[in-house]
């Protein structure tokens, strides 16, 4: 986190780093690149293909994004960590591009938004579909429980590292992929996003101040399990990857 707090200072050092001169360290176990991000801000319904498969109307590209939050200290786990499945949760998978903020700000101009990005990572926005509807809610309008749906422990595998922003030519031209036990479930391009990365950053910063170390998850493409009523089980191996950013391999285990 200290590097991100001093991102402007470290950027030229990292840009001039000669990767060929670095020594490869064997037998290292990777943990989440940001164990305790300040905020995990998530965009929902942000891919045309995903909206279509969920049976909703076509998203309005001129509309405002929908955001929700994940608790940063208990949901983020590493690229090889096990994830405990809550009971009766019908947990679903969602490969997502994660944007890591390096320069904070409020009311960020969309045209300068990418200047605030430190880098990008791979994320899996695991979702407890079975816990989303609440028939026991105290009042009918509160019958959809985003807290149980998105905030359970370990619901945000992240990593394997943070690829600096200058190494990614275009965040809207990346291929995302997710497999369960070797079977491809999701494969799409970030070009299918409804609201682009710069617009997401600008919109989020109008609501709250973005800080170094904040993570913005940018939505998931088509291929989730919900429309097919197919969910994760204990023992399943979920591989989440984005070309140029790396891959996560997370085993699902019983609660």
Feature locations, PLM:
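Structural signature of FAD isoalloxazine-binding scaffolds in flavoprotein oxidoreductases
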Residues: 59-78, 93, 234-243
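Short, structured patches in soluble enzyme cores that scaffold and shape functional sites
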Residues: 70-72, 80, 87, 93-103, ...
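N-terminal non-catalytic cap/leader segment that marks the start of a structured domain
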Residues: 1-61, 65, 177, 237-241
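Short, charged/polar surface micro-motifs in flexible loops or helix N-caps
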Residues: 47-48, 73-74, 104
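Catalytic-pocket segment enriched in acidic/His residues
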Residues: 23-29, 33, 50, 84, ...
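N-terminal accessory regions of nucleic-acid-interacting proteins
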Residues: 106-121
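Structural motif
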Residues: 39-41, 65-67, 74-75, 96-98, ...
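Short helix/loop capping segments that flank catalytic or ligand/cofactor-binding pockets
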Residues: 50-52, 77-78, 108-110, 130-132
């Amino acid at each position: 986190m200290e590097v991100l707090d001093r991102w402007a200072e470290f950027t030229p050092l990292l840009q001039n780093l000669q990767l060929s001169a670095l020594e490869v360290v064997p037998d290292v176990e990777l943990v989440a690149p940001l164990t305790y991000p300040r905020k995990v801000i998530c965009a929902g319904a942000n891919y045309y293909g995903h909206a279509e498969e969920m049976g909703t109307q076509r998203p309005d590209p001129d509309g405002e994004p929908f955001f929700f939050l994940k608790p940063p200290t208990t949901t983020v786990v590493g690229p090889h960590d096990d994830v405990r499945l809550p009971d009766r949760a019908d947990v679903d998978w969602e490969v997502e591009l994660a944007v890591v903020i390096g320069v904070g700000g409020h009311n960020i101009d969309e045209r300068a938004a990418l200047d605030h990005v430190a880098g990008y990572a791979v994320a899996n926005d695991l979702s407890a579909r079975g816990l989303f509807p609440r028939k026991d809610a105290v009042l009918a309008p509160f019958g959809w429980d985003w807290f149980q749906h998105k905030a359970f422990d370990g619901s945000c595998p992240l990593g394997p590292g943070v690829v600096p922003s200058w190494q990614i030519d275009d965040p809207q031209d990346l291929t995302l992929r997710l497999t369960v036990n070797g079977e491809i479930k999701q494969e799409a391009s970030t070009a299918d996003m409804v609201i682009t990365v710069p617009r997401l950053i600008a919109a989020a910063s109008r609501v709250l101040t973005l800080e170094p170390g904040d993570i913005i998850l940018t939505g998931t493409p088509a291929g989730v399990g919900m429309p097919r009523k197919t969910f994760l089980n204990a023992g399943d191996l979920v591989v989440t990857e984005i070309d140029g950013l790396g891959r996560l391999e997370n085993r699902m285990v019983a609660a």
